C-alpha cells in the first residue's frame, strides 16, 4: 500500500471515529411503579441522595405523565411513539399485531448506526420485531458495543414494582442492603383515599424503602459511565413507567397513577438553545410517549411522521403540548374504560362504564396488604369520607379536578357551575383526541381480535381506507350510552346499525338504564335486545344479555352467556364472566355452567386465567365460599 492510500484510509478512519464521537450516547434508567416521591421533588421522607444530586446536574420535569396507569400499555406506547389505543395494545396482557409502518423506534436508531441494548424488560404487548435490539437480555450492556458506534442503552429496575410491597420475600431481597437509618421513615401523612392504620402506614413506609434501594441502583449505573469516561458523551434519562404500585394509583388515571418523575442530564456539548441547563426545573407538559421521538431527535435521526409523540429536546422541537392524555382499558380480568386529559392545572376524566365500581375485585391488588386493609375497614363500616368515596357502587360520568388546589383529586368539580368553561374545554379536548388518534379502546376486545386477524393489524380497524367515519360514529355511540333515559329511543334505533361496534354500545347504554327506560320504549328495547342475542358478534350478544338481565329477562339471556363461556373466544369469555359477576343472584340458575368453566384451558393467554378469576369471585359471592385461584 502506498503512502497516499494509507493517509486516505487514516483520514476515513478518523472521520468514522469523529462521526461516532459527535453523536451522543443515550442511556435510559427506568424504574417501575413510583410517582415523583423523591426528595428533589419535595418529599422529605424520601432518601434519594443520588437522584437529588443527579437532578442538580440536569433538568427535572415537574409535569411528566404516562399514557396509562400500568406498565405494559405504557411500554408499548413508549417504544413505538404511538398511543396504545391507536395500535391496539391498550388491554393488559393482550397481543396486538402492528401495521408494517409502526415499529419500535430503535429500528431507526440502529439503521443510523447506534448500538441498542435493553436490560431487559420489554412487555410491549406485541411480538418484538426482529432487529429491534442488538441485545435484549439480562446481560445486555453498552460496554459490549463495537468501538466505532454510539449506543442507546436501557436498564430497568424492577425492585420497586408493586410485588416488592406485596411480597415479604421480595421486599426483604430488594432492601437487604439498607441500613437501619435508611429505613427509619416516619410517615407523617397518607393520601386521603387510604385508611390511616398501622398496616397502611407500614406499606407506605415500605414504598419509600424500595425507592431508597432504587436510588442506589441509579448511582451504580451512573458510576459505570464515570468509570468509562463517558459521562460527558452520554445523555441520561431517568423515568418511571407509571405511578405508585398501590390501589387508587396503579391502574388508575389520577395523578397518583399517571404522574411520574422525569430527569434528563444533557452534557454541555449537546445542549441546544439553552436546553438541559444543570439544575433547571421545567413545568413543560411531557408525555412519556414523547421519549422515543426525543431520542431520535437528539441522535440526529428524522422522527417518522406517523409517530404521535413529540420531541421535547434537540433541534427544531415542535411547540410544547397543551395537553397530555391517558387511557384505562382492561386491567387483568376487569374491564373499565376510562379516558383522561390533563393540562398543567386541570384533569378531566371520562368514565365510559360509570356503573362499575371503582374497586372492582381484581386478583392481584386484592392480595396486597393495603387493599386487604381497605376491605377490612369497609366491612367494619369504619371508613373516612376519603376512603368511602372510592367504595361507591358507581362513578360519575365525568370528573374534573383542579390539581393545584386538590392534588389528590378528591373533589369532583364537573357539576360546579364555576368550572363549566373548563369542563367544556377539557371534554372537547378528549373528544377531539378520540377522533385524531382513532381510539381503539371503544372497540370491544373480542371484536378487535377478530378484525385484526382479517386486516393484519389492530391499527387498520379504524385507520384503513374502508373504515370511513366509523370512529366518529363509534365516539358518538359510546357517548350516547352515557346520556341516560332521555336517549333511550336513539339507543334503540342504534341497535340496528350496520357495524357491530355501534350495536354494542347501544346494548351497553340500554343496560345502563334498564330499569329507567321510559314505559313507551320498554317493549321496543326488549325486542331489539332479544334480536341482538343472536347477533354475529360475541360482544353484542353478551352486552344484550347484560341489558336483558337488568330488565328482568334473565331466563332468555343466561343461555347466551353460558354459550359464550362454553364456546366463545378468549376475551368474549372474560366479558361474559364479568356480566355473570355483575348480575350476582340472577346468575344462580347457571352456577353449574360457571363451575364447569372455572377451569384453565390450554392454548389461551395464561390458560384463560382471567375468566377463571372472575368466575371464582362470582361463585364465592353466590355460595359464600372463599376459594382462591392463581
Cite the ranges covered by each PLM segment.
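Formylglycine-dependent sulfatase
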Residues: 12, 17-392, 407-428
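C-terminal substrate/ligand-recognition segments
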Residues: 396-410, 437, 464-482, 508
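Structural detector for internal amphipathic alpha-helices that build alpha-solenoid repeat scaffolds
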Residues: 468-485, 501-519, 531, 539-553, ...
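Long, contiguous interaction/recruitment modules in multidomain scaffold/adaptor proteins
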Residues: 404-461
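…; additionally, a secondary subgroup of soluble metalloenzymes is captured
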Residues: 21-24, 496, 509
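Short beta-strand-initiation
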Residues: 5, 334-336, 396
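Amphipathic alpha-helical scaffolding segments comprising HEAT/armadillo-like alpha-solenoid repeats
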Residues: 484-496, 516-533, 554-566, 586-599, ...
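Sec-dependent signal peptide recognition
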Residues: 2-9
Amino acid at each position: 500500500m502506498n503512502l497516499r492510500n494509507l493517509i486516505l484510509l487514516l483520514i476515513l478512519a478518523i472521520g468514522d471515529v469523529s462521526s461516532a464521537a459527535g453523536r451522543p450516547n443515550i442511556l435510559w434508567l427506568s424504574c417501575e411503579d413510583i410517582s415523583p416521591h423523591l426528595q428533589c421533588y419535595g418529599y422529605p421522607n424520601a432518601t434519594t441522595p443520588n437522584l437529588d444530586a443527579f437532578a442538580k446536574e440536569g433538568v427535572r420535569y415537574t409535569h411528566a405523565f404516562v399514557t396509562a396507569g400500568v406498565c405494559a400499555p405504557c411500554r408499548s406506547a413508549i417504544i413505538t411513539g404511538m398511543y396504545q389505543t391507536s395500535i391496539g395494545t391498550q388491554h393488559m396482557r393482550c397481543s396486538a399485531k402492528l401495521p408494517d409502518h409502526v415499529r419500535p423506534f430503535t429500528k431507526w436508531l440502529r439503521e443510523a448506526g447506534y448500538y441498542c441494548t435493553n436490560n431487559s424488560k420489554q412487555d410491549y404487548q406485541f411480538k418484538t420485531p426482529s432487529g429491534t435490539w442488538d441485545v435484549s437480555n439480562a446481560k445486555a450492556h453498552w460496554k459490549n458495543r463495537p468501538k466505532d458506534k454510539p449506543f442507546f442503552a436501557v436498564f430497568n429496575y424492577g425492585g420497586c414494582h408493586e410485588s416488592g410491597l406485596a411480597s415479604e420475600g421480595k421486599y426483604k431481597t430488594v432492601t437487604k442492603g439498607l441500613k437501619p437509618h435508611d429505613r427509619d421513615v416516619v410517615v407523617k401523612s397518607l393520601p386521603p383515599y387510604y385508611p390511616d392504620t398501622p398496616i397502611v402506614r407500614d406499606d407506605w413506609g415500605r414504598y419509600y424503602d424500595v425507592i431508597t434501594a432504587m436510588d442506589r441502583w441509579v448511582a451504580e449505573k451512573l458510576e459505570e459511565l464515570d468509570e468509562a469516561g463517558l459521562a460527558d458523551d452520554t445523555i441520561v434519562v431517568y423515568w418511571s413507567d407509571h405511578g405508585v404500585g398501590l390501589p387508587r394509583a396503579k391502574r388508575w388515571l389520577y395523578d397518583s397513577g399517571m404522574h411520574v418523575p422525569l430527569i434528563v442530564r444533557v452534557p454541555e456539548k449537546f445542549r441546544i438553545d439553552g436546553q438541559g441547563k444543570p439544575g433547571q426545573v421545567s413545568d413543560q407538559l411531557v408525555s412519556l410517549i414523547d421519549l422515543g421521538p426525543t431520542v431520535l431527535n437528539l441522535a440526529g435521526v428524522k422522527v417518522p411522521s406517523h409517530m404521535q409523540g413529540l420531541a421535547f429536546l434537540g433541534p427544531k422541537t415542535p411547540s410544547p403540548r397543551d395537553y397530555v392524555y391517558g387511557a384505562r382499558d382492561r386491567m387483568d380480568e376487569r374491564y373499565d374504560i376510562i379516558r383522561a386529559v390533563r393540562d398543567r392545572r386541570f384533569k378531566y376524566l371520562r368514565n365510559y362504564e360509570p356503573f362499575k365500581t371503582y374497586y372492582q375485585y381484581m386478583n392481584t391488588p386484592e392480595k396486597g396488604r393495603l387493599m386487604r386493609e381497605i376491605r377490612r375497614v369497609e366491612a367494619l363500616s369504619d371508613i373516612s369520607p376519603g376512603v368511602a368515596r372510592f367504595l361507591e357502587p358507581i362513578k360519575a360520568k365525568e370528573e374534573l379536578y383542579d390539581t393545584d388546589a386538590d392534588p389528590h383529586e378528591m373533589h369532583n368539580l364537573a357539576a360546579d357551575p364555576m368550572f363549566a368553561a373548563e369542563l367544556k374545554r377539557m371534554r372537547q379536548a378528549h373528544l377531539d383526541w378520540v377522533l385524531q388518534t382513532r381510539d381503539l379502546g371503544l372497540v370491544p376486545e373480542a371484536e378487535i381480535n377478530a378484525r385484526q386477524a382479517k386486516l393484519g393489524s389492530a391499527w387498520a380497524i379504524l385507520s384503513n381506507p374502508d373504515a370511513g367515519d366509523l370512529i366518529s360514529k363509534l365516539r358518538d355511540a359510546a357517548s350516547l350510552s352515557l346520556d341516560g333515559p332521555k336517549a333511550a329511543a336513539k339507543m334503540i334505533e342504534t341497535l340496528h346499525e350496520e357495524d357491530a361496534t355501534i350495536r354494542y354500545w347501544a346494548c351497553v347504554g340500554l343496560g345502563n338504564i334498564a330499569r329507567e327506560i321510559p314505559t313507551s320504549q320498554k317493549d321496543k328495547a326488549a325486542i331489539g335486545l332479544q334480536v341482538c342475542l343472536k347477533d354475529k358478534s360475541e360482544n353484542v350478544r353478551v352486552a344484550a344479555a347484560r341489558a336483558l338481565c337488568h330488565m328482568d329477562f334473565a331466563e332468555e339471556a343466561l343461555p347466551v352467556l353460558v354459550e359464550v363461556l362454553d364456546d366463545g373466544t378468549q376475551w368474549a369469555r372474560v366479558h361474559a364472566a364479568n356480566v355473570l359477576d355483575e348480575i350476582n343472584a340472577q346468575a344462580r340458575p347457571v352456577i353449574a355452567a360457571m363451575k364447569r368453566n372455572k377451569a384453565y384451558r390450554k392454548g389461551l393467554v395464561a390458560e384463560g386465567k382471567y375468566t377463571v378469576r372472575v368466575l371464582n369471585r362470582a361463585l364465592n359471592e353466590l355460595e359464600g365460599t372463599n376459594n382462591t385461584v392463581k
